[in-house]
Regions:
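Non-catalytic positions within long, well-ordered alpha-helices that form the structural scaffold/packing
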Residues: 28, 143-144, 297
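Active-site groove signature of glycoside hydrolases
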Residues: 138-163
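Conserved alpha/beta catalytic core and glycan-binding cleft of carbohydrate-active enzymes
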Residues: 147-149, 161-320, 348, 354-403, ...
């Protein structure tokens, strides 16, 4: 099935009831299948975005009551939207009124240097069965009590390896815990979606536990994200030298079940927003943003986007402020959110874009050596259908560009990124 998720940082502007009223129609209009919520377990520091948890069995009271949160989940379900909860099983807030030195000793955390994370939080000790049981129960709460449809687990690379450093070796206790957790979740809620934020090369993260895998359903493709954003941030004249960045993901894509994520981490801390990372003038950024998302939605793998990406948001995310909805009065930003919705519609209605996406026989490069022209072309296949995807990443048009197919084919245009309906300000060769 197609899966396009919107990551949502519920930041205090709406309570759970208001969020249901405002958010769900937007999700439907833009063809999202799921909404992923940043951690809603209780936490004291707004600036942690929920990733420094103190109350693992408490829904934060910032946005309403537990019953109101359950109502939000039910409202999403009535409209066919799944809810994925962000869960933090690796580290917890160092606050004295929470789990840190809970009984005056290192009860939940390690008692050595590995007990402290890079964020100043405490790392869970997976070699204590009581701690593993605590975390498994906390994860199950979201599925059992609130009927969430899946869990995204944060900072898994910091669990798989000691301090997230492969040079320090594998943390076998953490690996065993994650296997047990995923096995238990899949046993009890087999239709749930369980995904890992993991930037390491650890093997079999998405392999079933019965095959000695860690048992996640999906793993964020951090390599695809970095290479894609690096390429589109490169000046046009220098792009021939890094042409391979947009090819590399398909060299390893079938090693795991990858999900393509442009998340909250990419639009904060001076990194700039997605559109603002792109090279060029305002007009060139606008044209390239359509191309980048064309590439994302036609590349194999499920999709995840942080809120605001669909607006072409220029200001970095600030948990103290709402999104710049005033952008919608500008032609490009209004047309881009409609373009984003059209990509979602195309993804949901063209089976070749999701059927067999983890089958290497369902993808084929057609043009992957056009370094100077900046052109890429590939086939997506599935459900008896074949879609040809062509992308020009340079700022010059190609009136003619030969492509050779191994079979006779007619052609129907499904999407043109430079069509007038998208409010184009600059003509480039269409994707």
């Amino acid at each position: 099935k197609p899966n396009a998720t919107r990551e949502d940082g519920s930041d205090g502007w709406y309570n759970y009831r208001e969020l249901a009223r405002e958010l769900i129609p937007w999700l439907l209009d833009h063809r999202f299948t799921h909404v992923e919520l940043l951690p809603l377990a209780e936490h004291p520091f707004d600036g942690s975005w929920g990733y420094q948890t103190t109350g693992y069995f408490s829904v934060t009271s910032r946005y309403g009551t537990p019953a109101q949160f359950a109502g939000f989940v039910n409202a999403c379900h009535r409209m066919g939207i799944g809810v994925i909860m962000d869960f933090v099983p690796v580290h917890f807030a160092a606050n004295a009124d929470a789990l840190a030195k809970f009984d005056g000793t290192y009860l939940y955390e390690y008692d050595s240097d590995v007990g402290q994370s890079e964020w100043g939080t405490c790392n869970f000790n997976y070699y204590r069965r009581e701690v593993c049981s605590f975390l498994s129960s906390a994860a199950g709460l979201w599925m059992d009590v609130y009927h969430c449809d899946g869990i995204r687990m944060d900072a898994i690379s910091r669990a798989l390896y000691w301090q997230g450093d492969p040079n320090r070796g594998v943390n076998q206790g953490a690996v065993n815990f994650l296997r047990s957790l995923n096995h238990g979740l899949n046993e009890r809620w087999p239709t749930g979606i369980y995904m890992a934020e993991d930037s390491t090369n650890f093997l079999k993260v998405t392999a079933p536990t019965r095959y000695e895998g860690v048992g996640f359903d999906y793993k964020w493709d951090m390599g695809w994200m970095h290479d894609t954003l690096d390429y589109f941030a490169t000046p046009f004249g220098e792009r021939p030298g890094c042409y391979g960045k947009l090819l590399f993901s398909m060299h390893y894509f079938y090693n795991e079940l990858y999900l393509l994520a442009l998340s909250h981490d990419e639009v904060v801390h001076g990194k700039k927003t997605i559109i603002d990372k792109l090279w060029g003038t305002y007009e060139e950024k606008c044209a390239q943003l359509r191309t980048l998302y064309f590439y994302m939605y036609t590349h194999p793998g499920k999709k995840l986007n942080f809120m605001g990406n669909e607006l072409g948001h220029f200001r970095e995310w600030d948990e103290k402020k709402e999104l710049d909805w005033g952008l919608m009065k500008y032609p490009f930003h209004d047309s881009f959110q409609k373009y984003f919705a059209e990509l979602g519609r195309l993804y949901a209605t063209e089976p070749a874009l999701y059927d067999g996406e983890y089958n290497p026989n369902c993808f084929e490069w057609i043009a992957c050596e056009s370094r100077d022209e900046g052109v890429y072309a590939w086939l997506r296949k599935g459900a008896g259908q074949t879609i040809l995807c062509v992308m020009n990443t340079q700022n010059t048009a190609h009136k003619k560009f030969p492509l050779y197919l191994s079979f006779p084919a007619g052609a129907e245009e499904l999407l043109n990124t430079e069509a007038p309906c998208w409010g184009c300000l600059l003509y480039t060769s269409p994707s």
